[in-house]
C-alpha cells in the first residue's frame, strides 16, 4: 500500500464492486471502515443512472473491533435479502478491513442458511491485486459459481468440462460432439452467436464499444447470446456455453472468464480488440475461423439458409468482401488520415499511455494507419507488461511500464510531444 495523490487503477474492492453493480439485481456488501465507502458517491457522480448504486457498507467501527464483525455482517446480509430480494449478495472486504483477519467465508456460510438469495464472498487478495485484476477475478468467480450451481441441480446432464478435457487428449467424434453441447445439457444456438465478456460500469466508453460490436455482429449475421456483466442477470449465466464463441474486447476484464469457459466447454474466444482498420480486419477473420470450426464439429447443423447467409459459409470470401466494403465505402478512417487535423501530426512526436488494451491498440493505429511517430508507449497495467511489450515492439522508440504518474510526467517533459494520447492524468500533465 502507498499514499498517492492520484491512481490509475484503484484498490481491489473497487474492481469487485464495479462488477457487482454492473449486473442487474445483484447487491454488494462492503465490509469496510469509514473512508473506504466512497464507491457509491463516485459511481453515482460518473454514471448518473436512475437507480441507486446497489452497494451497502457494513462499517467497521469501535463496536466491531471490540466484539467482532460476524453479528453485524450477517445481519446486514439478512436485511438486504429481505429488503431488496437480490439474486446474489456479494460480500467483499477492503484492504483496511482485511487487516482484522476475520473468517468472512464463515459469515457467508452462516448467512446463506437463512437467506433466499445466493451469498458469495469475493475471493480476492486485496494486497496483491489492483482494481482491474480484482474485477477480472470476480467476474470469473461469479460465472463459475452459477455454472457449477446449475450442474449441481441437474447431475444427470452431460459434463461438458469432462468432454472438453477428453477432447484435449482424444480427437474422437463422440468427444467432440459432447464438447459442443451447451451449458448443463443445452445445445449450441442454431445460428452463429457470441458472448461479449467484460462490458461493465465505469469502463472507458464501454457502452459505445458494445453498441458498435453489436452492430458489427449483426452485419455479419452473428447473434449476441449474452453481454456480461453490464445489464446482465446472473440467472442467465448458465446460457453462456450456448454461444459458438466468446469475445473479450478488453484484456483487463473478461479474459479469465473466457479461459475458464474454454477449459470447461471447449469454447473458443478472441481477445483481439477491433480498434483501427487492421485490427478490426483481424478480428473479423478470427470470428470467421471460429465459426467455421464450431460448425464443422457441431452435431447440430444450422439450416442451409442460415449457413449461406452468415460468415461461416466461406471463411475467406465473405470476410474479405465485408472488410473491403467497409474500408473503401463506409469507414471514414482513410478520409481522416488525409485530413488537415491528422496531416499536422504526420511525422510529429507523440506519447501514448493508458491501460494495456487501449494503449497498445492506439499505438498501432497511429503508426500503421496515420503515419505518426510514437516516441513512448506505456501502460499502468504492470501485471500485463510482457504482453504489452510484445504488442508495441517495433512501433515505438521507448516502452514505459509504471503506475506512477510522476514518471510519465517526466517523460512527457523531456520529449515535449506534439500530442499526448492518454488518461485524464496525462491531460493535466499536458496542460
UniProtKB/Swiss-Prot annotation:
Active-site positions on this chain: 341
GO biological process: light-independent chlorophyll biosynthetic process; photosynthesis, dark reaction
Name of the protein in its database record: Light-independent protochlorophyllide reductase subunit B
Single GO molecular function: metal ion binding
UniProt keyword terms in alphabetical order: 4Fe-4S, ATP-binding, Chlorophyll biosynthesis, Chloroplast, Iron, Iron-sulfur, Metal-binding, Nucleotide-binding, Oxidoreductase, Photosynthesis, Plastid
Binding residues for [4Fe-4S] cluster: 36
Organismal lineage: Eukaryota, Viridiplantae, Chlorophyta, core chlorophytes, Chlorophyceae
CDD domains: Pchlide_reductase_B
Any one Gene Ontology cellular component term annotated for this protein: chloroplast
Subcellular location: Plastid, Chloroplast
E.C. code: 1.3.7.7
Catalytic activity: chlorophyllide a + oxidized 2[4Fe-4S]-[ferredoxin] + 2 ADP + 2 phosphate = protochlorophyllide a + reduced 2[4Fe-4S]-[ferredoxin] + 2 ATP + 2 H2O
Gene: chlB
Cofactor(s) annotated in UniProt: [4Fe-4S] cluster
Annotated source species: Chlamydomonas applanata (Chlamydomonas humicola)
Region annotation Disordered: where it falls in the sequence: 150-187
Family: Belongs to the ChlB/BchB/BchZ family.
Function: Component of the dark-operative protochlorophyllide reductase (DPOR) that uses Mg-ATP and reduced ferredoxin to reduce ring D of protochlorophyllide (Pchlide) to form chlorophyllide a (Chlide). This reaction is light-independent. The NB-protein (ChlN-ChlB) is the catalytic component of the complex.
Lineage top rank: taxon: Eukaryota
Amino acid at each position: 500500500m502507498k499514499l498517492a495523490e492520484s491512481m490509475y487503477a484503484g484498490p481491489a474492492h473497487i474492481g469487485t464492486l464495479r462488477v457487482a453493480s454492473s449486473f442487474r439485481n445483484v447487491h454488494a456488501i462492503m465490509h469496510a471502515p469509514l473512508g473506504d465507502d466512497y464507491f457509491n458517491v463516485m459511481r453515482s457522480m460518473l454514471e448518473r443512472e436512475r437507480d441507486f448504486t446497489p452497494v451497502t457498507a457494513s462499517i467497521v467501527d469501535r463496536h466491531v473491533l471490540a466484539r467482532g464483525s460476524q453479528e453485524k455482517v450477517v445481519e446486514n446480509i439478512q436485511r438486504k435479502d429481505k429488503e431488496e430480494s437480490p439474486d446474489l449478495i456479494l460480500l467483499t472486504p477492503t484492504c483496511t478491513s482485511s487487516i482484522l483477519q476475520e473468517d468472512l467465508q464463515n459469515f457467508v456460510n452462516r448467512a446463506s442458511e437463512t437467506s433466499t438469495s445466493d451469498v458469495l464472498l469475493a475471493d480476492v487478495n486485496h494486497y496483491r491485486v489492483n482494481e482491474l485484476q480484482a474485477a477480472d477475478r470476480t467476474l470469473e468467480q461469479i460465472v463459475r459459481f452459477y455454472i457449477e450451481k446449475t450442474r449441481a441441480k441437474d447431475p444427470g446432464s452431460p459434463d461438458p468440462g469432462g468432454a472438453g478435457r477428453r477432447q484435449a487428449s482424444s480427437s474422437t467424434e463422440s468427444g467432440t460432439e459432447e464438447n459442443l453441447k451447451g451449458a448443463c445439457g443445452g445445445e449450441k444456438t442454431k445460428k452463429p452467436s457470441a458472448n461479449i465478456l467484460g462490458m461493465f460500469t465505469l469502463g472507458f466508453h464501454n457502452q459505445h464499444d458494445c453498441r458498435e460490436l453489436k452492430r458489427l455482429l449483426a452485419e455479419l449475421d452473428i447473434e449476441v447470446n449474452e453481454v456480461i456483466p453490464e445489464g446482465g442477470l446472473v440467472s442467465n449465466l448458465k446460457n453462456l456455453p450456448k454461444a459458438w464463441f466468446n469475445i473479450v474486447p478488453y484484456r483487463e476484464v473478461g479474459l479469465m472468464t473466457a479461459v475458464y469457459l474454454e477449459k470447461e466447454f471447449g469454447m473458443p474466444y478472441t481477445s483481439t480488440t477491433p480498434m483501427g482498420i487492421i485490427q478490426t480486419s483481424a478480428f473479423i477473420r478470427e470470428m470467421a475461423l471460429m465459426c467455421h470450426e464450431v460448425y464443422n464439429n457441431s452435431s447440430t447443423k444450422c439450416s442451409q439458409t442460415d449457413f449461406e447467409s452468415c460468415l461461416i459459409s466461406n471463411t475467406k470470401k465473405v470476410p474479405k468482401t465485408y472488410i473491403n466494403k467497409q474500408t473503401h465505402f463506409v469507414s471514414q478512417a482513410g478520409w481522416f488520415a488525409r485530413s488537415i487535423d491528422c496531416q499536422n501530426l504526420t511525422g510529429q512526436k507523440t506519447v501514448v499511455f493508458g491501460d494495456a488494451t487501449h494503449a497498445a491498440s492506439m499505438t498501432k493505429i497511429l503508426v500503421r494507419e496515420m503515419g505518426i511517430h510514437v516516441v513512448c508507449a506505456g501502460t499502468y497495467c504492470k501485471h500485463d507488461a510482457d504482453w504489452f511489450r510484445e504488442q508495441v515492439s517495433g512501433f515505438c522508440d521507448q516502452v514505459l511500464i509504471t503506475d506512477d504518474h510522476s514518471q510519465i510526467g517526466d517523460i512527457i517533459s523531456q520529449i515535449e510531444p506534439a500530442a499526448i494520447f492518454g488518461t485524464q492524468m496525462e491531460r493535466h500533465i499536458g496542460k
